[in-house]
């Protein structure tokens, strides 16, 4: 029997590939080669699955990244910021999922609340890191917002900004803000 996480991972793959309308019980059971009984063993209908899917997205693509950066509590803000940038840049294929969740959030209230929570958590963490930088020519909160909007914009333009160009944008922004080469 597939685990709850197997169902959620399959849901994220479908969401990234084809958008929220593709995430149906029929598609999921077909993708996993399982019965609807297995699905209902883990979730109380479509609403329960979609709630769990949004929570899974948040856990994997926000909470997990922050927790990974915070594994070294003695690291200074600069080291943590660089580590976060490296983690974000390591998953360029994640952009399709980010785009799909944002598109879903435009049409669904629950997805919108989840996206707002994700954006708020991410920007609050970036603000915390930017406030801890030794020196910045840009106000810390503004720098945090700028770094986040670079990522969102890079994912949304067509074609999306390639990972190496996104890395260069981050490196230039951090160099302009701190006077140091961090990436």
Task: For each feature predicted by the language model, list its residue ranges.
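Amphipathic alpha-helical packing segments from all-alpha helical-bundle domains
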Residues: 62, 83, 93-100, 109-135, ...
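Helix-turn-helix
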Residues: 6, 10-52
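Short, Lys/Arg-enriched anionic-surface-contact patches
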Residues: 1-3
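Hydrophobic/aromatic-rich alpha-helical bundle segments in the mid-to-C-terminal region
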Residues: 112-116, 131-183
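Short, basic, alpha-helical segments at the C-terminal edge of helix-turn-helix-like DNA-binding modules
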Residues: 55-62
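Solvent-exposed, amphipathic alpha-helical segments
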Residues: 6, 10-18, 64-68, 101, ...
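Short helix-capping/turn signature of helix-turn-helix
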Residues: 43, 90, 101-107
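Hydrophobic alpha-helical connector segments
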Residues: 66-95, 147
């Amino acid at each position: 029997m597939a685990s709850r996480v197997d169902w959620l991972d399959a849901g994220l793959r479908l969401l990234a590939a084809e958008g929220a309308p593709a995430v149906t019980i029929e598609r999921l059971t077909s993708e996993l080669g399982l019965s609807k009984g297995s699905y209902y063993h883990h979730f109380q209908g479509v609403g329960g699955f979609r709630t769990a899917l949004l929570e899974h997205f948040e856990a994997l693509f926000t909470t997990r990244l922050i927790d990974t950066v915070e594994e070294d509590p003695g690291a200074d803000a600069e080291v943590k910021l660089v580590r976060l940038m490296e983690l974000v840049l390591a998953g360029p294929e994640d952009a399709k999922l980010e785009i799909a969740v944002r598109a879903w959030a435009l049409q669904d209230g629950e997805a919108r609340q989840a996206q707002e929570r994700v954006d708020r958590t991410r920007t609050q963490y970036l603000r915390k890191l930017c406030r801890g930088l030794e020196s910045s020519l840009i106000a810390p909160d503004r720098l945090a917002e700028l770094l986040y909007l670079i990522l969102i914009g890079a994912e949304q333009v067509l074609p999306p900004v390639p990972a190496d160009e996104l890395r260069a944008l981050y490196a230039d922004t951090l160099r302009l803000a701190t006077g140091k080469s961090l990436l």
